[in-house]
């Protein structure tokens, strides 16, 4: 993401002009734009025209509109963002108050104005504009006949390809059908890797599976690379890391990211940090349950006692339509930081973020037990807020 201009007043009102450059930047933008903001961007509008003979036709024109945002729709796999609202600035083609939907596009700038820029949103802009926060991990999660090729960016896990091939069982004395199907499966996975993984960007490619599937696949991959003199694969051989996963489904990626070998190799990535923080929370919940709580009310009480060591919070909570509720989460984050606690904002598009959402989206590891919280522990599991 490129920051073109930033003009925010002392009362935190103001506007920023940004240019999304990567598909992931559309996800950041989705987290920046909120109902009630004003958005100015270039868009296509269908307009009616009348010729000198009186015949009416229509054509599409590119114009710049400023909308008061009413609805936001994000397609995570296509990384497309549509913003619907009413026009609030005079325009040659669109009346004041008329509805329009702007589809924000990569490499086309937009200006976003807010009455209140909070700390969470401003921090996201900083992160989005930092070139170090780029996609740096790829993963092939597989079992016989099923594979998911994923990109793990700092903000989301993107499934780039799914490969499914029916593998017949081995029969006594006749394995040819099984072997042919397996080779066809491996070949499709290799093609998907070459099509979807940018080797000049990724630091590491995880190959995760149960049993010996990953070893057999990697043997096939590099035998074929030698046979076909595939320099791209051979030069990047050191980036491939084999780890265990219980299945070829996307959710098994979390197991791969938890592997100590992977964790040390990816220690500087946000995704690995999220996985470790959630893992630490579950361990604390199991071994010292009076120092691990989830649910907003419980966590707020722990914060009042200045007991929070690590706050785990889902980014989807900052997209809440109700301004007061959204502000409540922002205040919690600011307060934990002021009290020297660590704040981990989880992406709801990561496997770890999905798990945190099942725990109400907010959890905390405490520095020390808070007696009144321990007495109410039973309430947290039913708490939704």
Curated annotation (Swiss-Prot):
There is a cross-link at residue 162 (Glycyl lysine isopeptide (Lys-Gly) (interchain with G-Cter in SUMO2)). The modification Phosphoserine is found at residues 374, 380-382. It is found in: Cytoplasm. Keywords: Cell cycle, Cell division, Cytoplasm, Isopeptide bond, Metal-binding, Phosphoprotein, Translation regulation, Ubl conjugation. InterPro entries: eFR1_2_sf (IPR042226), eRF1_1_Pelota (IPR005140), eRF1_2 (IPR005141), eRF1_3 (IPR005142), Pelota/DOM34_N (IPR038069), Ribosomal_eL30-like_sf (IPR029064), Transl-rel_pelota (IPR004405). One of its GO terms (biological process) is chromosome organization. Its cofactor is a divalent metal cation. GO terms for cellular component: cytoplasm; cytosolic ribosome; Dom34-Hbs1 complex. It holds the Pfam family eRF1_2. Ubiquitously expressed. One of its GO terms (molecular function) is nucleoside-triphosphatase regulator activity. Component of the Pelota-HBS1L complex, also named Dom34-Hbs1 complex, composed of PELO and HBS1L. Interacts with PINK1. Interacts with ABCE1. Interacts with CNOT4. PANTHER family: PELOTA, PROTEIN PELOTA HOMOLOG. Component of the Pelota-HBS1L complex, a complex that recognizes stalled ribosomes and triggers the No-Go Decay (NGD) pathway. In the Pelota-HBS1L complex, PELO recognizes ribosomes stalled at the 3' end of an mRNA and engages stalled ribosomes by destabilizing mRNA in the mRNA channel. Following mRNA extraction from stalled ribosomes by the SKI complex, the Pelota-HBS1L complex promotes recruitment of ABCE1, which drives the disassembly of stalled ribosomes, followed by degradation of damaged mRNAs as part of the NGD pathway. Belongs to the eukaryotic release factor 1 family. Pelota subfamily. This is Protein pelota homolog. It comes from Homo sapiens (Human). The gene is PELO.
């Amino acid at each position: 993401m490129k920051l073109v201009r930033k003009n925010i007043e002392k009362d935190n009102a103001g506007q920023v002009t940004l240019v999304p450059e990567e598909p992931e930047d559309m996800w950041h933008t989705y987290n920046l734009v909120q109902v009630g903001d004003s958005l100015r961007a270039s868009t296509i509008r269908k307009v009616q025209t009348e010729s000198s003979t009186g015949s009416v036709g229509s054509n599409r024109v590119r114009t710049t509109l400023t909308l008061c945002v009413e609805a936001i729709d994000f397609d995570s796999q296509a990384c497309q963002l549509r913003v619907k609202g009413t026009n609030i600035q005079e325009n040659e083609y669109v009346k004041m108050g008329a509805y329009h939907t702007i589809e924000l596009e990569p490499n086309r700038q937009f200006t976003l104005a807010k009455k209140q820029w909070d700390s969470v949103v401003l921090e996201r802009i900083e992160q989005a504009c930092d070139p170090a926060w780029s996609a740096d991990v790829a993963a092939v999660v597989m079992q016989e006949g099923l594979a998911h090729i994923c990109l793990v960016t700092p903000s989301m896990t993107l499934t780039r390809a799914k490969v499914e091939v029916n593998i017949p069982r081995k029969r006594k004395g006749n394995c040819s059908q099984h072997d042919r199907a397996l080779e066809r499966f491996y070949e499709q996975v290799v093609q998907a890797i070459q099509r979807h993984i940018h080797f000049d960007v990724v630091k590491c490619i995880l190959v995760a599976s149960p049993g010996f599937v990953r070893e057999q696949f990697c043997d096939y991959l590099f035998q074929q690379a030698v046979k076909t003199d595939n320099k791209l694969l051979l030069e990047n051989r050191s980036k491939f890391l084999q780890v265990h996963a219980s299945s070829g489904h996307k959710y098994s990626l979390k197991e791969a990211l938890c592997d100590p070998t992977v964790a040390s190799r990816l220690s500087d990535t946000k995704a690995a940090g999220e996985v470790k923080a959630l893992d630490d929370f579950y361990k604390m919940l199991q071994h010292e349950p009076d120092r691990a709580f989830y649910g907003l009310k419980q966590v707020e009480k722990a914060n009042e006692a200045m007991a929070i060591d690590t706050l785990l919070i889902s980014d989807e909570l900052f997209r809440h339509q109700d301004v007061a509720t959204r502000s409540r989460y922002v205040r919690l984050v600011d307060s934990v930081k002021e009290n020297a606690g660590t704040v981990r904002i989880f992406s709801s598009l990561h496997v770890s973020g999905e798990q945190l959402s099942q725990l109400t989206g907010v959890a905390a590891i405490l520095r020390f037990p808070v007696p009144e919280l321990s007495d109410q522990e039973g309430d947290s599991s039913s708490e939704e807020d």
